[in-house]
């Protein structure tokens, strides 16, 4: 009986192993394909020429480079035409406009740049260089052997109560309260940076009774107290047209009073916040000059927003009639997709033309170029072309008076 049971168990094991082998032979796996689905191997076809190879074949040969170009150079219109490119994955490519070569700038990296940036973070200070994404930050903060570093400090926080359509600064109807330590912190930072020229600007604070003018003016006084040799330019808002606050700022001890009209009068309603106007900006500039006739007044316009030549000329005439001393022209560059689109990339020779026009009209100085901003390289351009000139005239007049026996106070 026992032997019969053992034999039966052996037969079952043999049968089971045969079934398992059969199943294993017919099982399919995710990494294998049915024989019928395996494609036949075909000889590799000759690779089709790529777009890049086609361009090389159609382009100039080595002998062309040696022998010199035989075709005439591009016209200015062709040379400065907008460059486009397709970017993105297949099926979702988008056409983008490439920046012209004259609008490209180096990545910021220098010891002066790093020192300024670290101090800003440590003292909780802001700059319009960063907030407005200025393309010149590496050049201005870095300085050089022939030019002092410049920086534009943005006072009263990083949140503006207005919403201009060209500006990337944050906006809010109720921004945070003012930092009472900011005037002293700003003066302390600037006194140890070794700057030759500083530009102070501020967000608009329509939520404050004085628009922040007293806070702004106190900062100027603190800076002059700690570093009297630093030249201070103040780029102010319009203080809602309050001439008392404009006068307070003009008499704070600054060297340059700047207020930007930003664009031509016809485009102002479409470019700037509805609370700003071209005529109100002119009144601010006139008010500053009236409060302090020795003050240099300055403004800036962006080009590339769709303005016409006649509109720019009209703006210059009105600015000169308002006794504005200095004007700058720069290319408008769209900071984000939610801001106004660029209407045109203005050619460098057009900027040169506007500089000549401004100087012919009697402006003391004009900085004009695609990358010029209101405070662009102020320490280099402004000191050399305006402030030093006035200082020499003042010294010359003092010497003449001294020769005549008059009491002179320099």
Swiss-Prot record:
Positions with a binding annotation for [4Fe-4S] cluster 1: 129, 134, 140, 375
Pathway noted in the entry: Protein modification; protein lipoylation via endogenous pathway; protein N(6)-(lipoyl)lysine from octanoyl-[acyl-carrier-protein]: step 2/2
Organelle targeting peptide span: 1-29
One GO MF term attached to the UniProt entry: lipoate synthase activity
Region (Disordered): 29-49
Any one Gene Ontology cellular component term annotated for this protein: mitochondrion
InterPro entries: Aldolase_TIM, Elp3/MiaA/NifB-like_rSAM, LIAS_N, Lipoyl_synth, rSAM
Catalytic activity from the UniProt record: [[Fe-S] cluster scaffold protein carrying a second [4Fe-4S](2+) cluster] + N(6)-octanoyl-L-lysyl-[protein] + 2 oxidized [2Fe-2S]-[ferredoxin] + 2 S-adenosyl-L-methionine + 4 H(+) = [[Fe-S] cluster scaffold protein] + N(6)-[(R)-dihydrolipoyl]-L-lysyl-[protein] + 4 Fe(3+) + 2 hydrogen sulfide + 2 5'-deoxyadenosine + 2 L-methionine + 2 reduced [2Fe-2S]-[ferredoxin]
Subcellular location(s) of the protein: Mitochondrion
Domain of life: Eukaryota
Keyword 4Fe-4S recorded: yes
Keyword Transferase among UniProt keywords: yes
Binding positions ([4Fe-4S] cluster 2): 160, 164, 167
UniProt-listed Enzyme Commission number(s): 2.8.1.8
PANTHER family: LIPOYL SYNTHASE (PTHR10949), LIPOYL SYNTHASE, MITOCHONDRIAL (PTHR10949:SF0)
Name of the protein: Lipoyl synthase, mitochondrial
